[in-house]
Amino acid sequence: MNILKCPRIAGLLATALLGGNAWAGGCSPIVIDLGNDGIHLGEAGVGVYFDVNADGVRDHVQWVRRGGDEGFLALDRSGNGIVDDGAELFGVGTPLILEGRSAPNGFVGLAQYDSRQLGGNDDGLITDADAIWPQLRMWVDLDADGVSTLQEMRTLGSLGITALETIPKLRKYFDEAGNVIPYWAWAMQRARPGRVLMVDVFFRQLPKFSGT
């Protein structure tokens, strides 16, 4: 068994990587480098209000850059065509269906759909051989406002993505804005170079203001 596919162990690793508290680095979704030019996030201190951990409260967090080519891996659970909250991304807000709790990180949330109980084939990849594949989407928040629209949603096929790794590599990387990227893997593409980076970003939390 790969230890990173075990939610309990993955949660303990997240705690260690993020300095003793899994929430210390903020709230996480999986982000994919669609432009294959590296992961470029927003400026320090510039954020949005978005309910990343799906608890009904909008979090003030740093975000992706405006006009960038980074995309959020998404699953439209509500069927309304857009992303409502972190339960429809892959991160700490992702429900672990067979366990009745939230995932410790995005890759654990994604890996559950590779299990045979949820229509997968347990090969370490999410592909069109897994039942979840047709439901996956990419949210490219072009205006970086934290509000999903129909125009910002893409299918994986339209982006040439053919497979998503579910077992990440470990690292502890802080970008210049203070976001933490403890996990990374590859998303496979038909076009060259054949794969692009996918990371679980723990966005830095920002101060909340009254009235939000």
Regions found by a protein language model. Name each.
Residues N2-G11:
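Bacterial N-terminal signal peptides that target proteins for export
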